[in-house]
């Protein structure tokens, strides 16, 4: 569970209360909004979304407290989170792109180990070894990407970085049940280099045209949205994996039903194989084996849809880069991490 939005809310609330004796609904509305939103996006899929009363009421709570919080920031003379940076075009675009970079970073780190564990039955050590490629590439590319971003218009590395990330993650659309270390190594290397470049460039673009007095507020918003984007991305991926796997299983089951000639042939072949092994109930064993194979194939197709979602998000962020305006070249505030 991603607790950064909650920690941010609590920290800001404590600072406001300690610096003022006047009661204010702002800290509590922000905390309620972030807590409710985070629970809904992370638990909604598993609880059936609005079929669950708690999810429904927390959604209503998130909407009401979110609107209240934004209204207070726009009308209060000393808001705890200034929304003035959103009047800058580059910051608004960079804000959205940082959300996508968080989604790609956390989403890729979520979906790959899940595939390796569920489909390939990898041990924790084998999963860690495979995932090491992504972390290593991001670690090694961070200083190179930082220098690259600072040496030119940040829009160029932004577009290139997200395009690389989209291509890398897009390789996963062709995933099969036989994919292992080397297939995912290529995907992770391209994705890792692209995400690192995009993260640094998005951070740079966000503040490239802001006046100095808005830098502090902008930095906090950017760091927050990257983690919130990651949490939202994980919730969407979880929903995609659950729903699309069910859809694919239904389609595959229909194609392989006993009423279908291809399904009959496959079942007959499996039954003969089970008979040759001397099983007591060869047809029952064949049906069980076929069901397991269909569930595995449906899960693989669901993972492919998850990779497609991540690739689509990165591609959209790359296109947003063309809407940004040229800004001053400034040192990036940080290279990010993994």
List PLM regions with ranges.
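Low-acidity, Ser/Thr- and Arg-rich intrinsically disordered low-complexity segments
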Residues: 8, 13-20, 24, 28-29
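Transmembrane core module of solute transporters
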Residues: 25-27, 34-39, 47-217, 328-338
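Hydrophobic alpha-helical transmembrane segments of multipass membrane transporters and ion channels
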Residues: 33, 92, 96, 101, ...
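Interfacial helix-cap and linker-helix signal at transmembrane-aqueous boundaries
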Residues: 41, 116-117, 148-149, 236, ...
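Hydrophobic transmembrane architecture of multi-pass small-molecule transporters
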Residues: 205, 222-326, 331, 335-338
């Amino acid at each position: 569970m991603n607790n950064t939005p909650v920690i941010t809310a609590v920290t800001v609330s404590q600072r406001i209360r300690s610096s003022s004796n006047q009661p204010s609904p702002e800290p509590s509305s922000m905390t309620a909004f972030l807590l409710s939103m985070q629970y809904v996006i992370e638990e909604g899929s598993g609880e059936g979304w609005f079929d669950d009363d708690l999810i429904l009421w927390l959604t209503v709570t998130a909407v009401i407290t979110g609107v209240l919080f934004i209204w207070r920031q726009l009308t209060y003379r000393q808001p705890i989170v200034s929304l003035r940076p959103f009047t800058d075009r580059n910051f608004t675009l960079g804000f959205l792109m940082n959300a996508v970079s968080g989604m790609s970073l956390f989403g890729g780190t979520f979906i790959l180990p899940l595939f390796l564990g569920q489909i390939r039955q990898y041990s924790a050590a084998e999963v860690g070894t495979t995932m090491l490629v992504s972390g290593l590439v991001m670690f090694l590319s961070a200083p190179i990407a930082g220098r690259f971003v600072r040496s030119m218009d940040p829009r160029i590395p932004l577009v290139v970085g997200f395009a690389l990330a989209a291509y890398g993650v897009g390789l996963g659309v062709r995933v099969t049940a036989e994919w292992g270390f080397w297939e995912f190594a290529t995907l992770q290397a391209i994705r890792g280099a692209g995400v690192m470049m995009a993260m640094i460039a998005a951070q740079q673009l966000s503040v490239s045209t802001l006046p100095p007095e808005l830098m502090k507020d902008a930095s906090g918003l950017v760091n927050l949205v990257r983690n919130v984007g990651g949490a939202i991305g994980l919730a969407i991926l979880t929903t995609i994996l659950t729903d699309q796997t069910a859809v694919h299983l239904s389609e595959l089951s229909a194609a392989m039903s006993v009423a279908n000639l291809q399904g009959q042939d496959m079942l007959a072949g499996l039954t003969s194989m089970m008979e040759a092994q001397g099983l007591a109930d060869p047809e029952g064993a064949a049906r069980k084996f076929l069901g397991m194979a269909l569930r595995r194939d449906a899960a693989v197709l669901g993972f492919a849809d998850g990779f497609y979602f991540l690739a689509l998000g990165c591609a959209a962020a790359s296109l947003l880069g063309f809407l940004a305006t040229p800004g001053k070249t400034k040192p990036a505030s940080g290279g990010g991490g993994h």
